[in-house]
Amino acid sequence: HFSEEWEFEFTPGFKTPDWAKGAVMYQIMVDRFNNGDKSNDVMTNEYAYIGRGVSKVENWMEPPAVDGTRQFYGGDLQGVIDKLEYLEKLGVEVIYFNPIFVSPSNHKYDTQDYDYIDPHFGKIVNDNGKLLKDGDNNNEHAQRYKVRTTDLANLEASNKLFVELVEKAHAHGIKIIIDGVFNHCGSFNKWMDKEKFYTK
């Protein structure tokens, strides 16, 4: 069954850049790569995701749960910066990042805010507000998450850290590709604001 709304077209005349041809690419799911800044880690019960509170994994070597989308290991952009020399020695020429924009999941394919890097991957400079109580899945009470992911200082500091990462990667001869998921978003997205994080 053919349906035009599902037909994706290639960009006419697009040519693969020479630097990408034959390049050694290394894909990074940031949360599971390396924790370089523990101050930005998602906290247990910081908010609810898919009907339950999220959790911080304390033991980096603990295997993910079958439904591990609420588990956070704490990997971040500082962790990638800390490993650039290692990646260069591996022969990596391009880092391909899974989505890194503000999002409630560890995989970040359900974007909350396309304008900013998630402060849980970047920098949290303003950090206050209450966590959810056990069993409370109402994100209107998730004040810590709201501050962490909507405070402009946190968002701008996170974007700045990403720029720093790109500059340092380039200094190591590594190019950066990010996965931008623009054909769908999640219920936390500021346009829908189902969780009331953007309501004044």
Regions found by a protein language model. Give the residues of each.
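Acidic/aromatic-lined carbohydrate-recognition and catalytic surfaces
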Residues: 2-200
